[in-house]
Structure formats: C-alpha cells, structure tokens
Amino acid sequence: MILVYAEIINSRIDYVFRLIFNQVLKSDIEFTDRSTKFQQSDLPKINYSYEKFENEFYIKPHRLLHCQALIQPDIQPVWYEGEKHFFESSNDSDLPFDPFAASFYLVSRYEEYLDVEREKYKRFPAGQSILSKYGLLKKPVVNIWANVLAKKLQEKYPKLKFPAKKFDFRSTIDIDNAWAVAHKGVFRTGGALLKALFKSDVY
C-alpha cells in the first residue's frame, strides 16, 4: 500500500494515480488530503502537493491536473536516464518531471481538445502529436514513466515491492474475408480471383 497526499484530490488526480499504480504497477494506493495523517504514516508515501514536508517522496505537481479549464502547456522534453519525459518538475522533487501530469496528458488525448490543425475529415493527425514531434510514437512512454517512478520509490523505500509483470502470447487469425468468400458464390469468387491475377495481387 502506498499513501498519496494531495491538497485537493480531484477526478484527474484520482484517475491517473489509479491508472499508474493499479493498472500498470499492480499496486494499491490510498489517498489523503490530511497532512498530519500523511506525515505520521509509516507507509511508503508520495507527497503530490506544492509543499514539501520532510524526507517523503516528493513530486511538485504541474498545474495541468488542477486546472478545470483547458490550458495549452508549453511542453519541452526533460532528459532523464536516457529517455525523454514531459512536464518538468521542481529542483526539490525526487523526479525532474511530473509522471502523473505527463501520463494524464497522453492517455486522455488532451492535445486533441486544443485548437489544433486537423485534416480534411476533422480528425487529429498523429503527425501533429507531441509524441510524433519528439519521436516517441512507437514507445510505451506511460509504462516507461511508471517504471521510472517505481524504481525511484524503491530507492526511497527499499521494502516496497511491485509484482513482477507477466506476459503471454496469444496468436489470432483474422478470418473475416475467408468467411466472406464462403458465401460469395462461384461467380463472385471467380471474378475476384481473375481481378487479383490481372493486378498481380496474389501471394
């Protein structure tokens, strides 16, 4: 169990903390907005507020998670341990970036709600995304940030353990088209085959 302190526990903070700890790191958290309870607790703890207390794990929050209105943050990458991170934090924070604001920005697709140029069908082009801008489209950045956070927490609280991740391989076969062929009939199937031959679209 990890105790999280925030001055205001709003829906954004609740969502992104549970995403990172419950879904990605498979760990339990508890929130409190009572500073006395937080400081007296013996649990591993995260102070996500604008005031650092003592020697707890501290991250000064970016204002993104506290704003009710949409804002257009100026996002510059923060280099840390060979990776790019977003939303720079303070010098007295245990991480140089805010993994919670950064993760919320991405998983909520926040940038798609801003006044940005769209393609002809009014869709948000991936090439305009912050991940594309910094060459991160193919990286699981939220998982990377969560792992960085977990590592730093374990340095502060050596007894804190996170469950080992389990992976499995599930092979699937898309048979939609094969099923469709079974019901097209001889003439339609033959015509499609001839068309494919003329186009050299046969494998």
Q: In which residue ranges do the predicted regions lie?
A:
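Terminal accessory/targeting
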Residues: 1-203
